[in-house]
UniProtKB/Swiss-Prot annotation:
Pathway: Amino-acid biosynthesis; L-leucine biosynthesis; L-leucine from 3-methyl-2-oxobutanoate: step 2/4. This is 3-isopropylmalate dehydratase large subunit. It is an enzyme of class 4 (lyase). The lineage of its organism: Bacteria, Pseudomonadati, Pseudomonadota, Gammaproteobacteria, Alteromonadales. Belongs to the aconitase/IPM isomerase family. LeuC type 1 subfamily. Its EC number is 4.2.1.33.
Amino acid sequence: MAQTLYDKIWQAHTIASINEQTDLLYIDRHLVHEVTSPQAFAGLREKNRTVRCPEKTFATMDHNVSTKSRSLDAASEVSKNQLMALDANCKEFGIVLYDLNSINQGIVHVMGPEQGITLPGTTIVCGDSHTSTHGAFGALAHGIGTSEVEHVLATQTLQQKKAKSLKIQINGRLRPTVTAKDLIMAVIGKLGTAGGTGYVAEFCGEGIEALSMEARMTLCNMSIEMGAKAGLIASDQITYDYLKGRPFAPKGADFDAAVKYWETLKTDDGAQFDHVVELEASSIQPQITWGTSPEQVIGVDECIPDPDKEPDLIKADAIRSALKYMGLKAGEKLSSAKVDTVFIGSCTNSRIEDLRAAAKIVEGKKVVAGIEALIVPGSGLVKKQAEDEGLADIFKAAGFEWREPGCSMCLAMNDDRLGAGKRCASTSNRNFEGRQGRGGRTHLVSPAMAAAAAIHGHFVDIRGEA
């Protein structure tokens, strides 16, 4: 019987069937950070349990760290306590930790792939919803809650109900200056934030095959924003070239043998999906969210929707509420709204390709006076590479702040927060009310779009910048 990629990974990791809908799965990799792990470790200690597979558990500091300093003292008292607890827990239970003194420290979903921890065909979990990022490698990866973090630490297993399968076919290739961020935002705009609920999505087609690994990570990162349990892209030569030589990837003959197995992990011809969606890549333009949900998104040259023209009364009310919070008017273009802050970073867009795209836009230009502009690399390795390539110098010369790695302004859990009423062009993944700070107004965009907003003071069509 023909199988999807999801079917194959699920079957390979099923230890036992709990009932007709639920199986017990083996977990290959467990990623840990300071926010969702303290209670899990405390639970182990209370029950006198050990970590079953510390060699398959990897930790980093990311959510609460200061991006202005590598000192623990730069974090708030609560954040510092969580960071210190992670350090103590990893030492006690024998877990690899990339702390603030390590060049490998970074956002967990940047660190995992660049270390070769993320591999095709594996099951990966983390106490963070954007674990879907790792699906770009053909891995089944998703977020879990703190009680499940404890369970995986103790057993290296997880009970899961198998989801339905969703195929998202991208025909043709994206146009120049249109990125994977624009693609996934367009998909979310089409399906809505509940369109993927109950599904694991597989992205395929020429438009996906043409993407780099970093672009694929951006795409899968926001699978959760359309409600999907996980996002998958079958591995290929681009994947294998990315992984070869990375610290935790197989080496030599073992790598060659792994590739032979990974090449079998593709959806079979004739395999049936529960739902199929198709998009033409060439029809997608640079995207911007205008509201307070990732599905409230428009193309850069489109107008903000009018609630009076929306036949769905619930959607119309949602539009009115979002317009009020965002301080916008229906029928306007977003170029009329001035930007106060620009944030380029997060697990969605803080990799070297993202920084190169932003630097290309800002080189030789200046950030508009009064705009706070932050560049926060996703890891110490990304930071060093950007500095070696001269990108950091370009950003600093333009007036950007060049920060240390961390989750930063993606979420208001550290000192990088958006002020009330301030409008931010952000390369992060969520634009909910208060996500970046109480009263803050978030517009999700690609790195190039964010960079262009910094030097113009408002959103512009970057197709005219290239």
